[in-house]
Amino acid sequence: AYIGTYGFSDDYSTYFAANLSHTNLIKWDVMSGRPLYAALRYIAQNFIGSTPDFTLFRVVSVLSIISLGCYLFFFLKRAQFPGGVMAWCVTPVLLCCLPSIALFGAWATCFPYATSILLAGASYSTLNYCTKLREISRFVSSVVLLALSFAIYQPTGMAFALFMLIDNCLNDSQLKYKKIFKDVIVIA
């Protein structure tokens, strides 16, 4: 169903903007706090000539969801998520099959949203696990990655809090309040 020649109602607004050079939709995206999404959507408009062209964006989104699943596997492993290999394999599959994530794969206009979740995860990992970088570099890089994630779609940027929860609360290690404080500063 993902790789078919169909479009949802919002996909047609993208189609309309692409074929009639209607920039109000781009302006709306920027004004609603999604400037990177607006830029990506503007670039994407150059590739849309008909409904079957939405397939390309669904493929990009599905590949992003697959990448998200792989990232989640390695993140859960590093965070020592309880349940071992079985939990590390099953949990990413279940999370990537949530209706909202599945919608990102089916709805062409949502093509960068799964990437936004990946950016939030990369932000969290950079802040807490890139020990080769100096602390200030990790902090700045993390803030930039999270800002990019929010600039695509704010709700997916909030996935930073999910990574924070998994790493700090859903494992057998003790809470590290300094780490939690840094995480809260970045997300604030």
Regions found by a protein language model. Name each.
Residues 159-188:
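Perimembrane helix-loop-helix junctions
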Residues 138-154, 159-160, 165:
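Membrane-interface alpha helices of multi-pass inner-membrane proteins
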Residues 120-139, 173-175:
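Membrane-interface transmembrane helices that cradle and orient dolichyl/undecaprenyl
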Residues 34, 86-128, 151-156:
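Membrane-interface micro-motifs in multi-pass membrane enzymes
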Residues 2-18, 28-40:
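Extracytoplasmic catalytic/substrate-binding loops of multi-pass membrane glycan-assembly enzymes
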Residues 59-81, 122-126:
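Transmembrane-helix motifs of polytopic, lipid-linked glycan transferases
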Residues 28-55, 59:
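Short hydrophobic/aromatic helix or loop-helix immediately within or flanking a transmembrane segment
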Residues 2-5, 44-49, 77, 97-107, ...:
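Juxtamembrane "helix-exit" motif on the non-cytosolic side of transmembrane helices
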